[in-house]
Amino acid sequence: MELPDSPPPLDAPSPPHFLDAPQDRWNVFYPAVQTLVNALGGYEEVESPPDSGIFETVYRPGDSVLGVLKDLKKLWRKDDEDDERTVARCMYRAELMKELVAIVVECAERGEWGRKVALVACDLIAALTWPIDVAQELKEIEDEGPVVTDYASLLRAQLEYKALFLKTTKPLKSILSLMVPCLAKPRKDEKDSRIISLGLHVVRNLLAIKDAVAEGTATGEKEEFAHLQSDLITQLDSLTYLQLFLTLASCADKTDLNPFNVIVLDILHLIFRGIKPSELVQDQKRVPIDSLAKLLEKEKKQKALNSRVGSTRHSRFGTTITVKTAEQRVVLHRQTAIIENPGKILDMTKRKKAVVAKRMDDLTVFVNLSSDAMVILQSFSKAFLEICYNTFIESILRDIRMERTKIRPSDNIRVFYLSSFFIEYLLLLRHKLLQKGGSRRLEELPLGLVAQIAEMDSVKWLFARLRICWDDKPKAWTELQACIECFTQILLLIDDMSTSTNEEDVEVAEILQHQLYYNYDILDSALAVVREYKNQSIAYLDSIIHFAYVLLRMLEKYSKTKAFMFIRKRKNTHKKRKERQAASQANADREQRKIPEEYGDEGEEAFAPDEDAPSYAEHAFTFQSFEKRFAQEAVVNTLLTYLERFLEFDGPEPMKRVVGLMHRQVIKAHAEGLYFKVSTLIIFRRILDKQHVLPAAPSSRDLITLITYILRKFFKHVEKEPFTLVEALSSKSRGKWKTVGGGSDDDDDEMAGQRGRIKEKMGPVELQFIKKHKFSWSQQMSIAFAIIWGDGHGYLIKWIVEVLEQVLAAKQEIVLTTDGGINGDEDEEDEDGNARVRRFGRPSDEAISKFTQFDLQPEESEQITAVTSNPHFRLMLKLLSFDLPPPPMELDFEEDVSSEELALAREKSDSAWFLPANVLPSDIEASIGALKQYMEEPPTLDDDPKKLLRRKARATRRRRRSPSVESYDSETGEVRPGHQHKKNPRQKRAKKAVETQNYKSAAFIEDSDDEDPEATRRFFENEERLRREMDELAAQGGHPMMERGVKRKRGKKNGKGAISDTPPPSQRGNDRET
């Protein structure tokens, strides 16, 4: 806002609501502020020493300076409800800060009265320089309507306050003199703590004021305001403020100094905010030379870009080229049209689509410190690492966990930022020492200097904050970026520990990696943050790319050292939600019965498990399957957004990270189809056109090679499937990029779309080998392998080999822990005292009893499709000893189920493959060896392998007609004979045998506890009658059973029929040959 040149007269009439408009508030407050400022004191010329004729300007406080300062504090409180901060603007116009600084310098050492005046002045200085969060201020007044507030003038005023404060070292020296007596006391009361806190807050406020951004040719005031932070750091060092900060940080665990750890955290964050550790670790004498080299390299790159355009303002040679097409004629007036593609030149003349500018960084600010300030910070950073980092961070984390009132939400960001800064700084220092003096000099800076943030409790808290920021609505992007950067540096620290020469560091790194990777949520977060990137800042984009690159690289390195890995994964909440709904329905039914409250069990509800708490289960883990999860279009979009800024990359490292992640998708996950899009091809063309300006680094060459590979794959696919050009215009959903060539011939089934429903109704096709060929197991496996390999499904074979290797490793582990070796020679005895006998190469019975069933759990859509509907792959699974559970029937369910639910259950059972527990490790090892041998040397067959198979006949399911209501006897539960359906004799015999067996069993079970003597008598009479009948039939049939229990072969009459038409009751239902 524009301030008036002179205030109106004090006796001017006030409007009715004079405090409603900012101009009216100015007219009221400015005269009062100006009067009070004039009453504070003034400057006068004093001869010093007396009679010397030399005069100096000295500030003389007024007689009532203390009361005036208190009146100014009362006026300051008027701004609490004023969005315009009118009183603050009045104090700036009245030059109050100049008076306050002079009072502090003059009165700080004038005894008790002078200290009191100086402290009140410091209180006003802290209020005037308090940081203004413009974003938060605008957010608060957002709902109040169109309020226009000039925050730029307020920020400019604070910048001038900072410059005024730093003109000499006397103000900071006076503030330190106020704090030192309080710091020296062994027992500090509340007043001492408030004085120390006030002095630290003044320093914090000065550090928080950002420097002005000035051009390199700026002079005068602009140049002065651009280097205030450097001057402040220099004064803080010369006045021993930095040593004071080190003392407070190292004693943060002490009771008397712990209250100041949060303000020290804020000060340290402001000191290092915007400074890159890579810049701080450099030799400051060479910084100007390196900066000049970067500028020359940037200029060279820009010239190379301009030379390709080739357009000059004044040229000696004029060029005009005519391009004729079938319908039009285009004239080009460019010299580059001689050698360039005319279509590309025409594209350059098209109107460019405006690109939305993205924020560079929300976490840090731009700073340009001088070389002297950087040298001071180098020594200060190293001293902070060696003396107090672990103690200081531990005290902060303890206060955060205990939820102290002094902890603010923004303190989490400061902890993350400082931790990531000092970890990266330590790693860079160690790398520099390693280059200079070898590994022996690394002992000067051990990794334990930053061990506190790498503790498992700290890492868990860090990940918990990451999840909270991610789940917030809207997401806390700034804290999330700080979390990700800190997590990345912790991973790099663990990686450095794993390669250390210190055995203790290696052991700790092994434990930390195991605990980190066991929690699958941490691994899943890397995929989530990369997938969900939209329009956040460029620094956030760089952070998530770096995080994903480091995590995948370390996880791959760790998985190679382990035969098998397990993870703790959160269960699917869909099933749990259904169970909760069923439980709520049961509770509702229970409520309908109206059970009195006094009979309810209150303790049961108190100790009931939390329904909202997540449940977890342990799963086998393979890096290949996790790596394939990164083959998603959302991840590709994030990588391409990062790659688009290839001309802005600062060094080869960013290019190396994005190329590494793209290589995992294209080469290792075989997902090059994700890049078959028009927008992606345009980016690739831009990179190929400007590859001459890429840095001369291996990562640049890898990028060009990868792009060439993707383009070659794309055009080969276009030759095979021209419809790919149409698919390149659409997005690639999950699994769609595998079939980017378009629809298949099965889309038109010539059956009005009924073929798919019929196939779905019939279930998956089952195959079997033609029996007349009598193939061995190895021959059957070679045939199945040849079919799958020939269809281009080799990735399925690689996947099943990995699964078998996991199962084999798990079973071998059980054998080793149980038997202590396969062919031990020691004599062992079992529980009965008998010697344990073990054959060579076979586990003991005890080890076999510990084997568990392994459930095959496909993760990718292609794997799920293969185990469900690929008949050749299902045949291979059977050859590898995998099995399927029997299809569920209606009797398997406790409650009645609908036909749709029964069909869904049967569909799930068709894909629930499992490896039985009784499969021995030797059999699995043989299967793995056969598959690997075929993968190295695929088998060659003379005949078509598909002709050696045939469809397996399905067992027909017969339905039994339900009896009608009239034919059902409600008393006996039987069907009346008159209403029974006619059956052939074979069905009658089978049914009668089943009925007889059921009758005998039912009579025994139901009457076992019956005390009715009449029922007992009838039961034994029935048994005696059945026994006589059996004896008679046996005598007529000629003793069909031999003494050894083997069934006697029946003779034939006239080549057909059996000797006896009616088998004995003992064999009814078992004779299926007649």
Curated annotation (Swiss-Prot):
<feature type="region of interest" description="Disordered">
    <location>
        <begin position="936"/>
        <end position="1074"/>
    </location>
</feature>
<feature type="compositionally biased region" description="Basic and acidic residues">
    <location>
        <begin position="1014"/>
        <end position="1031"/>
    </location>
</feature>
<keyword id="KW-0539">Nucleus</keyword>
<comment type="function">
    <text>Involved in chromosome segregation during meiosis and DNA damage repair.</text>
</comment>
<dbReference type="GO" id="GO:0003677">
    <property type="term" value="F:DNA binding"/>
</dbReference>
<dbReference type="GO" id="GO:0051321">
    <property type="term" value="P:meiotic cell cycle"/>
</dbReference>
<feature type="compositionally biased region" description="Basic residues">
    <location>
        <begin position="978"/>
        <end position="991"/>
    </location>
</feature>
<keyword id="KW-0236">DNA replication inhibitor</keyword>
<feature type="region of interest" description="Disordered">
    <location>
        <begin position="572"/>
        <end position="595"/>
    </location>
</feature>
<protein>
    <recommendedName>
        <fullName>Topoisomerase 1-associated factor 1</fullName>
    </recommendedName>
</protein>
<feature type="compositionally biased region" description="Basic residues">
    <location>
        <begin position="1046"/>
        <end position="1055"/>
    </location>
</feature>
<dbReference type="GO" id="GO:0000076">
    <property type="term" value="P:DNA replication checkpoint signaling"/>
</dbReference>
<keyword id="KW-0227">DNA damage</keyword>
<dbReference type="GO" id="GO:0031298">
    <property type="term" value="C:replication fork protection complex"/>
</dbReference>
<feature type="compositionally biased region" description="Basic residues">
    <location>
        <begin position="948"/>
        <end position="962"/>
    </location>
</feature>
<dbReference type="InterPro" id="IPR044998">
    <property type="entry name" value="Timeless"/>
</dbReference>
<dbReference type="GO" id="GO:0006281">
    <property type="term" value="P:DNA repair"/>
</dbReference>
<keyword id="KW-0234">DNA repair</keyword>
<comment type="similarity">
    <text>Belongs to the timeless family.</text>
</comment>
<dbReference type="Pfam" id="PF04821">
    <property type="entry name" value="TIMELESS"/>
</dbReference>
<dbReference type="InterPro" id="IPR006906">
    <property type="entry name" value="Timeless_N"/>
</dbReference>
<keyword id="KW-0131">Cell cycle</keyword>
<keyword id="KW-0469">Meiosis</keyword>
<dbReference type="GO" id="GO:0043111">
    <property type="term" value="P:replication fork arrest"/>
</dbReference>
